[in-house]
UniProtKB/Swiss-Prot annotation:
Keyword ATP-binding listed: no
SUPFAM superfamilies, per database record: Enzyme I of the PEP:sugar phosphotransferase system HPr-binding (sub)domain, Phosphoenolpyruvate/pyruvate domain, Phosphohistidine domain
Necessary cofactors: Mg(2+)
Entry's localization field: Cytoplasm
Gene: ptsI
UniProt lineage: Archaea, Methanobacteriati, Methanobacteriota, Stenosarchaea group, Halobacteria
Its EC number(s): 2.7.3.9
Protein name: Phosphoenolpyruvate-protein phosphotransferase
One annotated GO molecular function: metal ion binding
The family this protein is said to belong to: Belongs to the PEP-utilizing enzyme family.
Amino acid sequence: MTERTLSGIGVTPLSGVGTVVWYRPDADLPEPPAPVDVDAEAELARFEDARAAAEDELEAERERTAERVGEEEAAVFDAHVQFLNDPQITDGVSDAIESGLPAEHAVQETFTEFVEQFENMGGRMGERADDLRDVRDRLVRVLSDGERVDLSSLPEGSVVVAERLTPSDTAQLDPERVAGFVTVTGGRTSHAAIFARSLALPAIVGVGEELQSVEDGTEVVVDGESGDLVVDPSDERKEAAAAAADVDIRHEAVETADGVDIEVAANIGTLADLGPAVDRGADGVGLFRTEFLFLDRESPPDEDEQYEAYVEALESFDGGRVVVRTLDIGGDKPVPYLDLPDEENPFLGERGIRRSLGPDADLFETQVRALLRAAASADGANLSVMLPLVSTVEELRAGRERFESVAADLDAEGVANELPEFGIMVETPAAAFMADQFAPHVDFFSIGTNDLAQYVMAAERGNERVSELGDYRQPAVLRAIDATVSAAEGEDCWVGMCGEMAGDPDLTELLVGLGLDELSMSAVTVPQVKAAVAETDTADARDLAERVLQADTKAEVAEILTLDQ
């Protein structure tokens, strides 16, 4: 066969070689019949039962995904529960049933109308149509007593090819068996793309209808960086792809071309993330999210359970720095043992350090005790701790005083402990504006660009209609980063970054130029960012940063960065 290439959007900087396995889940969905004489009351009851069963499935799936992939990725299933219970949708299904449709057909018809509405909006809103499809297909399957297709045990070396992959589909994929996936539709910010990065899977989306010409069993090369799908590749192409898949991972510290050390660390959402982070060459952990210890359970973890988790992270990196973020939970997450307020906008409400110094003070003290003990667990244990959502000097001082008072308590009890390196997340405009006042009181700042962009631009992260505003390439966001780094200069205070921006190799030179000392990201991009650091000259990087900071618009920023590539 002659080698040919199809092009799409590469979403992971990884390559894979394997055999096509087509996944066509829509084939078994029933076509809606003309309205018939049905027992509307019985069908409505079936629909309600199916909703309850689907919600139970989603909660279980959320828990599995949080454990296997990460808490942030698992949050997509919270959105699915919202769709499942959305009054507009449920009322539409009820109306369709009362007009004479059986429940499964009413679900299919109503959800499909909403899917089309989302697709017509385009952009990121269009990508969210896959979430609606996922909920629709789940309900239809439950109503039809259908079996769920199992993607978790595919033959080794499979390349999954599909019209689209929903979050439920992608969460099943096993990186040990699957060599990658390719879809007809989709974009860089789709949930399938996000899961691919978290699972370290080569992936291409948005190839278009030409992908339908690739048959089951065909050998392919998936280049997740360029977006090229090579069909019937030559032996030379396969060997080159296999070599590319065997990434030259640096397992030692990296420095710029002119000798400046930059730490490249991994973000950790569960203990299962530690192994891949080590394997991909992370120097340490730049963000250890502790929420997974507290979620999906009926009571909080005790001191010893937390201690063991923190020690496991420290031992995984054997002297590499592990930065733990204290509990950051608010009204957006269901925690049965906490009295969380029902807030209109929980992201601007009682969360993070606000709860730790208030209603969750006892929980915070237990966490602090575990952290102080972990810091003294072994010679060379390199633990740092940071507080989330700090906005005032009073919060910072109170948080630090809590660590010092708990350390005194442990000393009095004769329990080995050590005060770790202490810092704060910079994710609110207040923290960026007040960074010069915070710097004398901390050992480090960690800039959370996802939330910083959201709060600086007043553009909710989950609201697709304003997603372009909440981009970290916005000049206001870049200037907030620059202000934070500038405030740390002259103080014994290093500056890291743990948002999505840190893991973009195309932005590494800019971030070095802005003065970042540490970059933390999903483990999958660690090798590429290390390679980008090694190619960066700090003088050139500072020049790039100065030019970017003069830009008035996001488009100007993008143009400067493109010209510099």
